[in-house]
């Protein structure tokens, strides 16, 4: 049913990074002179989506969220992570108050808050699926939801995988595909890769979409060629989703993330080579040389 709309509407692929400001990007992707409150506006000329990782650590102030909305186009996408007290500390139980506060805080984003991202801890396994199902049933309408699991059973045990898919499908929620296969193909060769090896989960590539809005998080290596070679299966998968009329959001990471904005645009170009109907990304704001004043 997805493919019937492909030729009738504009085709847009949303791509982005794990953050919108990062010191190594100053002067390379973002102008040196920008204040912190203007960096999202510049980032949004490179990418049309961003992971909302900061919301995991604290619910943002209303004025902060209003600033995010003012700096981005109406079709820019934030995939916002639910706060840690909801997912990790209370494990989805008795979370009405923090959830209500979070939803009120992000209201100024409107449709820019494209999906709310429920990242669950590695200890959240098949035995906890009833808690997840109950939580998803209680969530308000008007938002899209995507769930990231890290417990190995969901990837190694077909029965557990199918049970999780049923829970998500009943709620209309997506399964976030977090692909770390390239990161763990070979031993790390840089400090950033060694740190990523310690912190990131070993998860397989999972390319099955449950909804019309798939979410992919891909992490490569610090060597650009390794990262590009590793994402080739995703180019085909994402192109296929677009042809089916789905609307994916793809995030490109590397352990050091130094070249992430450029890699994001390269991935977008690779998909456009397969699906020429995809709209081009915005023209990036010139970063300019460093200045003394």
What are these model-predicted stretches?
Residues 3-293:
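Residues lining hydrophobic/aromatic ligand-binding pockets adjacent to catalytic sites
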